[in-house]
Swiss-Prot record:
Gene Ontology process terms (BP): GMP biosynthetic process
Keywords for this protein: ATP-binding, Cytoplasm, Glutamine amidotransferase, GMP biosynthesis, Ligase, Magnesium, Nucleotide-binding, Purine biosynthesis
Gene name in the database record: GUA1
Domain GMPS ATP-PPase: 211-419
Cofactor: Mg(2+)
Signal peptide: none
Name of this protein: GMP synthase [glutamine-hydrolyzing]
Lineage: Eukaryota, Fungi, Dikarya, Basidiomycota, Agaricomycotina
Length: 544
């Protein structure tokens, strides 16, 4: 049987991103409805797609549709013959293509608004709001975020919702399944928004809602076995984080001991991390694991380096070098076994496992237009450039919460599935300044105390990510009767659904007091603790 691609396994909704801060939420809402969807940049040429979507959603955008540099969709999308939903800018783009008028409006709408649904009496035109219960006053609360709006309907379109200041809040084509809404149904501030999206993807597009982690496991295991064959071997880097652990366990379930995990100790891991990961993967999960201690090499190359991008490149390049050397040993052993045992031996090592997630893919997309690469992700690209291996990424289509759900279904213990994310470059990007053994030891100790206190307070599972950053500043303090001049650490904790946006976590004051007291008393060289209360955006989760 030929390898089945995901689009042949699941009906797919195509989301075309025009750079909206909410675009990823459209994807999340579809996934929550057990509908598979994929987001691509708005510049995507439809003729280049190897698959046909069941429907298309056009996202919002910070641009004005009539601006000279405004992004525009490939007109071929309207010849696919599938349902289309435009959200905010997407509505305006539909109007532009079909001959409507969009202008800057004197009364901009930002925040909550109440829309009135207009029934046309025709099933296809009314489908977007069909079955949605209105509020007591007959309206529907939604979230607006637009300065431009549709001022004249395109030919053959009708109004299906309005507000006092926006007469064309939602529109539908008279005879084709093309819809547009000026509000944002994907955000939580539109209470019935998910139902609007459900009406489009399920009722209008008739998508089969087969996307779930329960259905994903057997299909992905079958796909892996088909790719690797009966004897093909796979190597993969693991860190002890959720992504690589779940990927390793899934691979082990598919091909057993033909999967070889490699952990590279780069010297900037969490306290005792290498020992903990070795036990976790080998004893608890039964995965073949080799741990390579390359800390001396990494730290030597990081000496004197302060720039975060240089740190990333040094760690990334050194990791590749060390990983390739260890992989070569495993490949040589496989070749030797093949020569000695012939047909009874396992096959060659042909594949490289990576735990890439869908947010990595989204944030790594770079194109001319409203979206741009936010930062280089260590999971995307780089490792295969010098290796004669083919890439296998079983988690590439998944969000973090889906990966955790997958891990639970694979019977990975909760304390492993629930671990907070840890960056590929490790503590090097949590040390603002030069990375030295002394700085690493300080940060490891402070971070260990912080996480211990968060767990003790019963808050760990309520927080999406928590860590300590070591700042490149010193502050005056008092210890006993003596003046101190020591370093400052920042503690960070965020809550998020998918790490595309995040809010800072509100700790009880007594917990923060305990954290600060323990760190300043127990960590030599630190006399001040600050708490980071920055959301994403405008900040990122990590400091560097």
């Amino acid at each position: 049987m030929a390898t089945e691609e995901i689009h042949s396994l699941y009906d797919t909704i195509l989301i075309l991103d025009f750079g909206s801060q909410y675009s990823h939420l459209i994807t999340r809402r579809c996934r929550e409805l057990n509908v598979y969807c994929e987001m691509l940049p708005c510049t995507q040429k439809i003729s280049d797609l190897s698959w046909k979507p069941k429907g298309v959603i056009l996202s919002g955008s910070p641009y004005s549709v009539y601006a000279p540099d405004a992004p525009h969709v490939d007109p071929e999308v309207f010849t696919l013959g599938v349902p289309i939903l435009g959200i905010c800018y997407g509505l305006q783009e539909i109007a532009r293509v079909h001959g409507g008028t969009v202008d800057a409006h004197t009364h901009r709408e930002y925040g909550y608004a109440k829309i009135e649904v207009v029934k046309t009496g025709k099933k296809e035109q009314d489908a977007l709001f069909e079955g949605i219960e209105m509020e007591a006053d007959g309206g529907l609360q939604v979230w607006m975020s637009h300065g431009d709006q549709l001022t004249s309907l395109p030919p053959n379109f009708v109004t299906i919702a309005s507000t006092p200041t926006s007469p064309y809040t939602a529109v539908a084509h008279e005879s084709k399944p093309i819809y547009g809404v000026q509000f944002h149904p994907e955000v939580s501030h539109s209470p019935k928004g998910k139902e609007v999206i459900a009406a489009f993807v399920k009722n209008v597009c008739s998508v089969r809602d087969g996307w779930s982690m329960e259905s994903f496991i057997p299909k992905e295991i079958a796909r892996i076995r088909q790719i690797c064959g009966e004897k093909g071997q796979v190597i993969g880097a693991v860190s002890g984080g959720v992504d690589s652990t779940v990927a390793a366990k899934l691979m082990h379930e598919a091909i057993g001991d033909r999967f070889h995990a490699i952990m590279v100790d780069n010297g900037v891991l969490r306290k005792d991390e290498a020992k903990k990961v070795h036990k976790m993967l080998t004893v608890d999960l039964g995965v073949n694991l080799t741990v390579v201690d390359a800390s001396e090499l990494f730290l030597a190359r990081l000496k004197g380096v302060e720039d975060p991008e240089r740190k990333r490149k040094i760690i990334g390049n050194t990791f590749i070098e060390v990983f390739e050397a260890e992989a070569a040993k495993l490949e040589a052993a496989a070749e030797k076994e093949l020569a000695e045992k012939g047909g009874e031996a396992k096959g060659k090592i042909e594949w490289l496992l990576q735990g890439t997630l869908y947010p990595d893919v989204i944030e790594s997309i770079s194109f001319k237009g409203p979206s741009a690469t936010i930062k280089t992700h260590h999971n995307v690209g780089g490792l295969l450039e010098d290796m004669k291996l083919k890439l296998i990424e079983p988690l590439r289509e998944l969000f973090k919460d889906e990966v955790r759900a997958l891990g639970r279904l694979l019977n990975i213990p909760e304390h492993l599935v629930g671990r907070h994310p840890f960056p590929g470059p490790g503590l090097a990007i949590r040390i603002l300044g030069e990375v030295t053994r002394e700085q690493i030891a300080i940060l490891q100790h402070a971070d260990d105390i912080y996480i211990e206190e968060v767990r003790a307070a019963g808050l760990y599972d309520q927080i999406s990510q928590a860590f300590v950053a070591l700042l490149p500043v010193k502050a005056v303090g008092v210890a006993g009767d003596a003046r101190t001049y020591d370093q400052v650490v920042a503690v960070r904790a965020v809550s998020t659904e998918d790490f595309m946006t995040a809010d800072w976590f509100v700790f009880p004051p007594q917990v923060l007091k305990r954290i600060s007291s323990r760190i300043t008393n127990e960590v030599k060289g630190v006399n001040r603790v600050v708490y980071d209360i920055t959301s994403k955006p405008p900040g990122t989760v990590e400091w560097l």
